[in-house]
Amino acid sequence: MLWFKNLMVYRLSREVSLSADEMEKQLSAFSFTPCGSQDMAKTGWVSPMGSHSDALTHTVNGQIVICARKEEKILPSPVIKQELQDKIERLEGEQHRKLKKTEKDSLKDEVLHSLLPRAFSRFNQTFLWIDTVNDLIMVDAASAKRAEDTLALLRKSLGSLPVVPLTLENPIELTLTEWVRSKTLPAGFALMDEAELKAILEDGGVIRCKKQDLFSDEIAVHIEAGKLVTKLALDWQERIQLVLSDDGSLKRLKFADTLRDQNEDIDREDFAQRFDADFILMTSELAALIKNLIEALGGEAQH
């Protein structure tokens, strides 16, 4: 089981029926196929259980997990530039004239097409967890762009997907700043030793702290000077560690060994049973963490 490393959280903005059986059919029309000789990139769905299953969806207790794979061809720009330059010089020598810009652009396309079949591929996978009980969608992505790209593929596959980023009643950075300033955190949360503080003004400074006592006078001075806490490392119930950002994303999730070891009694050879047990454990813990975080940060914005 792949334990999520990051979470971008989205709210289903209206009731939608997301049945795994129906989704299976819809996703299969957009299943992953590798790049052809002239493709720069391809994205599609693969089984979240890897080679252990052909199913594109996996559901347990109303929690659905799916996985998008992306293949990108790697063509380093210096290689393209050199190949293009060689071609331009050869043609200009043969024709005894300078090539026009349109001709050079056309040559660049030719160069790309000739290099593509020989290019290496880079693959990445993005897992997406749909919590049909709480009407939330979580993407294991460190950037909003990657999360949005994955949601766009899901929207295309399903026909529509009414989701918005989870938004809170109060600006997150104001709440985080108050936690550090007052040296008081909500029940269940403990401060760790990492943070980012930013000046309110756009051209103001940014301070990134690691292995730092965040309740120290040094940090207090920065807050008094008007800096806001925009990232904060937290420990939740000694079960999950994370870095919470002012955009609501959860990065660098780290599950406690005591948590991850709970299913050690299940034989690793029984992949399906272990996958289910780990998925149930991970989603129940993360759902509880998200619920606690929303409450601690002042509640969800009412639209």
From Swiss-Prot:
GO terms for molecular function: double-stranded DNA binding. Pfam families: RdgC. The keyword Cytoplasm applies. It is found in: Cytoplasm, Nucleoid. GO terms for cellular component: bacterial nucleoid; cytoplasm. InterPro entries: RdgC. The keyword Cytoplasm applies. Disulfide bonds: none annotated. GO terms for biological process: DNA recombination; regulation of DNA recombination. May be involved in recombination. Belongs to the RdgC family. This is Recombination-associated protein RdgC. It comes from Yersinia pestis. The gene is rdgC.
